[in-house]
């Protein structure tokens, strides 16, 4: 009789323990499966997220084989408005230039420049001080391509033509002799200098242009003197190269 009672009791205890442990085992199985799938997902995510960087060189297509180019810059010019004036004048304006390249090294260049500013004046009874003066240049000549690579270049040029000097526009109707100015006139002009270019792309260039400017003005009063002046000019701007037409 004791055997029959103990057996059902032991069986009942074993069954109860099994029922209690079953959820724990199931939870551990799910946790292990979730952890395994998480590792796989993270690995896949890291694999697909890795990209390749492509380096683009904006100067890769820079070639010195274009037939035409044009440039425009803000310009500065120092000059003297009269043959005996002690003070010079600093003028500002625009510098427009264009080139037609004949060979790899040689081309023809033209320029049009306008400068405007005020100038010192000789003592006068009309209290004229700091009148406006202007110069308009036009010229053409050869240019030569010097050292160059994809980053930049040096170009030399020598252009000759004329200048229209307007010196009497702000004298209140008085003659130029009152302030020792030149008369309004057309005169010979020469521009000798060059360009310093910094390429920014196949088409666009940052350009600095220093020049020596020669002028030959005269006066029609007094001794009718003619003055040969050499002054400094500088412009800073941009150049555009038309690359479809090759040399």
Residues of each region from the PLM?
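Sec/Tat signal peptide C-region and signal peptidase I cleavage site
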Residues: 21-27
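N-terminal secretory signal peptides that target proteins for export/translocation
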Residues: 1-7
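Short glycine/proline- and aromatic-enriched beta-strand/turn motifs that initiate or cap beta-hairpins
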Residues: 27-100, 239-243
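Transmembrane beta-barrel outer-membrane domains
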Residues: 63-67, 87-91, 101, 129-137, ...
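Extracellular loop and loop/strand-boundary signature of outer-membrane beta-barrel proteins
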Residues: 57-58, 80-84, 121-131, 174-182, ...
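Bacterial N-terminal signal peptides
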Residues: 10-20
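Outer-membrane beta-barrel "beta-signal"
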Residues: 230-247
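Gram-negative (and chloroplast) outer-membrane scaffold detector with strong preference
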Residues: 97-177, 187-189, 193, 200, ...
């Amino acid at each position: 009789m004791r055997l029959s009672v103990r057996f059902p009791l032991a069986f009942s205890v074993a069954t109860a323990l099994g029922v209690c442990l079953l959820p724990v085992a199931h939870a551990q199985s799910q946790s292990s499966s979730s952890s395994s799938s998480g590792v796989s997902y993270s690995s896949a995510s890291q694999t697909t997220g890795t990209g390749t960087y492509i380096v683009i060189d904006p100067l890769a297509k820079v070639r010195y084989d274009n037939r035409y180019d044009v440039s425009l810059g803000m310009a500065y010019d120092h000059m003297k408005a009269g043959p005996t004036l002690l003070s010079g004048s600093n003028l500002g304006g625009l510098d427009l230039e264009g080139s037609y390249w004949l060979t790899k090294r040689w081309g023809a260049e033209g320029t049009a420049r306008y400068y405007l500013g005020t100038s010192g004046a000789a003592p006068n009874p009309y209290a004229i001080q700091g009148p406006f003066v202007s110069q308009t240049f036009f010229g053409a000549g050869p240019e030569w391509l010097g050292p160059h690579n994809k980053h930049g270049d040096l170009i030399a040029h020598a252009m000759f033509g004329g200048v229209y000097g307007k010196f009497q526009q702000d004298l209140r109707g008085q003659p130029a002799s009152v302030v020792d100015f030149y008369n309004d006139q057309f005169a010979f002009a020469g521009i000798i200098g060059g360009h310093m270019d910094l390429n920014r792309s196949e088409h666009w260039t940052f350009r600095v242009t220093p020049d020596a400017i020669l002028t030959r003005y005269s006066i029609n009063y007094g001794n009718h003197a003619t003055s040969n002046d050499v002054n400094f000019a500088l412009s800073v701007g941009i150049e555009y190269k038309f690359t479809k037409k090759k040399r």
